């Protein structure tokens, strides 16, 4: 599953240079990293569930997940400093492209009534974030092994600081964006 990186090198770069009118190949936008994160919410107090969430994300990403801890105590949310509140994985290079290809080809088509991902997830600096409601769309996740059904946020960080260029890059890589009405 290393075809997406070669597709980027051979075809996407050429199309980006033409469409964005960029002469210097070093200035072409590229995908730098993908961050998969889960907030545990009400389940943050149960360490077994936290371990299960981290294990599930590790299976999906193919890399060990890190359990994130609260930086501050917040009485309204009943969170103390240092308490586990979620898990995340940062993917780069080969694993990043493998995950993206699996997401585009296998996982997103398994979502019920899928009409594309939202175009509104850009942050103004060339990064794109979208959410997935449940982890069962990934083939590595076995229904019997999960304790709690949870979603996840997927953030794609690009080398450009322009949303238009980042959108063009992700679209050419094959991300299925929703059609504009």
Curated annotation (Swiss-Prot):
GO terms for biological process: translation. Keywords: Ribonucleoprotein, Ribosomal protein, RNA-binding, rRNA-binding, tRNA-binding. SUPFAM superfamilies: RL5-like. PANTHER family: 60S RIBOSOMAL PROTEIN L11-RELATED. This is one of the proteins that bind and probably mediate the attachment of the 5S RNA into the large ribosomal subunit, where it forms part of the central protuberance. In the 70S ribosome it contacts protein S13 of the 30S subunit (bridge B1b), connecting the 2 subunits; this bridge is implicated in subunit movement. Contacts the P site tRNA; the 5S rRNA and some of its associated proteins might help stabilize positioning of ribosome-bound tRNAs. HAMAP family: Ribosomal_uL5_B. Part of the 50S ribosomal subunit; part of the 5S rRNA/L5/L18/L25 subcomplex. Contacts the 5S rRNA and the P site tRNA. Forms a bridge to the 30S subunit in the 70S ribosome. GO terms for cellular component: ribonucleoprotein complex; ribosome. Belongs to the universal ribosomal protein uL5 family. Coiled coil: none annotated. Pfam families: Ribosomal_L5 (PF00281), Ribosomal_L5_C (PF00673). GO terms for molecular function: rRNA binding; structural constituent of ribosome; tRNA binding. This is Large ribosomal subunit protein uL5.
